[in-house]
């Protein structure tokens, strides 16, 4: 049996591919294209060459990883159907997030090719959602969900399963229960994910930049800077009311057999308050270890390989130069893992996977990070 956090794994269990940087929305809280997003500074947007994506997918297929896309908006990628087909015909699961605005146009083809799950982003009733994501977006997404459900019924297919991702911000924190219990037909969904807005303080971003400079020779951290928010912007949220809504939606999902995920997992008032106050050490869900860098490979639209969204400033290789599996077994990733065996980065609390528990391991007894 391999030890926990072993470098001996032949391939990642989870491969996440950023097909492109382009998006057709400008959601206010997005760390890529939002008000403080890092992509506004890009001179030219990147997207991966289709043949390079397919070659990387085929390289991984014998190891049967789970795949995920992200963007930008993944459904804007011209070669998405070829990539979906290669993954699904190769016997692997595929899930990806989408803003939902293109579902109606592609409902039949999505059902025909059958990605395992789509995570559709909605942030409240129409007026509230559109305040964050853009005018008319809610209606377009709802039409898409209905078209997809109709196409699934016609084909007699369960795929793609549908999930809703709801990002809690100061603008929509009062509307969580209203949306899920009265604003959407829960019978359409197999899963619900409610995530408190990811962010980092200025001090965390600076400390992260210093760590990357000192230990890895990285000169700048523009991606990390896209997460920076002042915790004061969350001070108007009614933490008691928000927590009660989260618990209510969780119970409603449990009654209907819908998978419920929250970030953080512990739905208690003080835990939620500590999150929005950047009191990370007081969080019940805090971690001092994470398994994600040992199981996940993320490929950016520029070909750069990292192990986590929050490490996009710290690539360990590029698939334009080396194969993904060579990078996975390479010295740069071993160096990163060696660092993370001793401590996490200051920016790790800005990661949804850190709070979601997908990669969490119990903290060693000898440390209290």
Give, region by region, the residue ranges found by the protein language model:
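Radical SAM enzyme [4Fe-4S]-AdoMet core and its adjacent flexible, acidic
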Residues: 117, 121-123, 130-289, 301, ...
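Residues that line or immediately flank small-molecule/substrate-binding pockets and catalytic motifs
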Residues: 34, 71, 122, 196, ...
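Flexible mid-to-C-terminal extensions adjoining Fe-S/redox cofactors in radical SAM and related proteins
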Residues: 1-11, 33, 275, 279-369
């Amino acid at each position: 049996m391999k030890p926990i956090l072993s470098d001996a794994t032949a391939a990642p269990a989870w491969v996440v591919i950023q097909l492109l940087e382009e998006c057709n929305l400008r959601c206010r809280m997005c760390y890529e294209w939002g008000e403080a997003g890092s992509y506004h500074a890009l001179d030219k947007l990147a997207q991966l060459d289709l043949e390079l994506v397919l070659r990387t997918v085929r390289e991984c297929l014998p190891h049967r990883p789970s795949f995920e896309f992200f963007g930008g908006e993944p459904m804007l990628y011209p070669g998405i159907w070829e990539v979906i087909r290669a993954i699904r015909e190769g016997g692997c699961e595929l899930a990806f997030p989408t803003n939902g605005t293109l579902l109606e146009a592609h409902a039949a083809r999505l059902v025909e090719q059958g990605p395992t799950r789509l995570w559709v982003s909605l942030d409240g009733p129409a007026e509230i959602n559109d305040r964050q994501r853009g005018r008319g977006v809610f209606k377009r997404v709802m039409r898409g969900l209905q078209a997809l459900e109709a196409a699934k019924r016609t084909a007699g297919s369960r795929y793609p399963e549908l999930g809703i991702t709801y990002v809690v911000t100061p603008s929509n924190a009062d509307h969580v229960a209203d949306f899920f219990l009265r604003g959407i037909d829960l019978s359409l969904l197999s899963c619900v994910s409610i995530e408190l807005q990811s962010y980092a303080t200025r001090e965390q971003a600076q400390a992260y930049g210093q760590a990357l400079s000192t230990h890895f020779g990285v000169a700048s951290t523009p991606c990390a800077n896209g997460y920076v928010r002042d915790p004061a912007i969350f001070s108007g949220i009614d933490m008691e009311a928000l927590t009660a809504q989260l618990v209510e939606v969780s119970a409603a999902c449990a009654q209907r057999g819908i998978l419920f995920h929250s970030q953080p997992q512990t739905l208690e008032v003080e835990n939620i308050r500590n999150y929005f106050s950047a009191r990370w050490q007081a969080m019940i869900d805090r971690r001092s270890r994470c398994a994600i860098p040992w199981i996940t490979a993320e490929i950016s639209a520029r070909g750069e390989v990292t192990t986590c969204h929050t490490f996009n400033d710290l690539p360990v290789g590029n698939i334009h130069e080396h194969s993904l599996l060579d990078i996975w077994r390479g010295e740069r990733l071993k160096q990163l893992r060696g660092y993370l065996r001793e401590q996490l980065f200051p920016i790790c609390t800005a990661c949804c996977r850190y709070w979601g528990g997908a990669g969490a391991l119990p903290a060693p007894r000898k440390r209290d990070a």
